[in-house]
């Protein structure tokens, strides 16, 4: 191959790779504090979404005189995430390393990526919220990517990719008039709220340890 042709090919290859290299470099230049701020904002939004949806579902479909029995039913009292070893109190949380807490948070987020696509389909009135199932999914997906980026920065400086959890929660049932469906959805929403609370708590702990001046909130 002629020298000129070889040079042209190398130049073309470099131009094709430039956007990727710029993006990879951009992640490295973003201050760690900003990465944490963004992840914490998304974690808080996900937690608030879980709280609001749980309360709305409870007020809409669960009779007050049956709330206790619903909450203590075996189908609603056990969460899939209970099979993931997670700290159960602040003392246990403090004993976990930053990467351990981020990995647990990533597991929890990934277990909800598919179910959250059907989160709002439970409600007969889909106008209960201003956003859509797609927005909910992208919120968790963005949080997943943010946690992966933090793991890479804290571990070796590179962004981690690829899901590490294959098993997830089941989908929400759209049959709001069926007792079993109500029980299933109520249990799923209980678990969603519980898991998002853990994610926000774990991320706050890692941020406090990693970013100076971020513990006083």
Curated annotation (Swiss-Prot):
Gene Ontology biological process terms, A to Z: animal organ development; growth hormone receptor signaling pathway; positive regulation of receptor signaling pathway via JAK-STAT; response to nutrient levels
GO molecular function (one): metal ion binding
InterPro entries attached to this UniProt entry: 4_helix_cytokine-like_core, Somatotropin, Somatotropin/Prolactin, Somatotropin_CS
Cystine pairings recorded for this chain: 79-191, 208-215
Signal peptide segment: 1-26
UniProt cross-references to CDD domains, sorted A to Z: somatotropin_like
Top-rank lineage group of the source organism: Eukaryota
GO terms under cellular component: endoplasmic reticulum; extracellular space; vesicle
Keywords on record: Disulfide bond, Hormone, Metal-binding, Secreted, Signal, Zinc
UniProt function note: Produced only during pregnancy and is involved in stimulating lactation, fetal growth and metabolism. Does not interact with GHR but only activates PRLR through zinc-induced dimerization.
Family stated for the protein in its record: Belongs to the somatotropin/prolactin family.
Protein name, per record: Chorionic somatomammotropin hormone 2
């Amino acid at each position: 191959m002629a020298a000129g042709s070889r040079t042209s090919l190398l130049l073309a290859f470099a131009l094709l790779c430039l956007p990727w290299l710029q993006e990879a470099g951009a992640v490295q230049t973003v201050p760690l504090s900003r990465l944490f701020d963004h992840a914490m904002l998304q974690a808080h939004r996900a937690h608030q979404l879980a709280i609001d949806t749980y309360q709305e579902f409870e007020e809409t479909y669960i009779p007050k005189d049956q709330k206790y029995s619903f909450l203590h039913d075996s189908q609603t009292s056990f969460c899939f995430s209970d099979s993931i070893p997670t700290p159960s109190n602040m003392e246990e949380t403090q004993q976990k390393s930053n990467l351990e807490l981020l990995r647990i948070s990533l597991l929890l987020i990934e277990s909800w990526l598919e179910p959250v696509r059907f989160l709002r389909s439970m409600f007969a009135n889909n106008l209960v919220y201003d956003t859509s199932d797609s927005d909910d999914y992208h919120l968790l997906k963005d949080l997943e990517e943010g946690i992966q980026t933090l793991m890479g920065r804290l571990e070796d400086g590179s962004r981690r990719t690829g899901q590490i959890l294959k098993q997830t929660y089941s989908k929400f049932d759209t049959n709001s008039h069926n007792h079993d469906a109500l029980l299933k959805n109520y249990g799923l929403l209980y678990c969603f709220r519980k898991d998002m609370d853990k994610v926000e708590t774990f991320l706050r702990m890692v941020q406090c340890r990693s970013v100076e001046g971020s513990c006083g909130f």
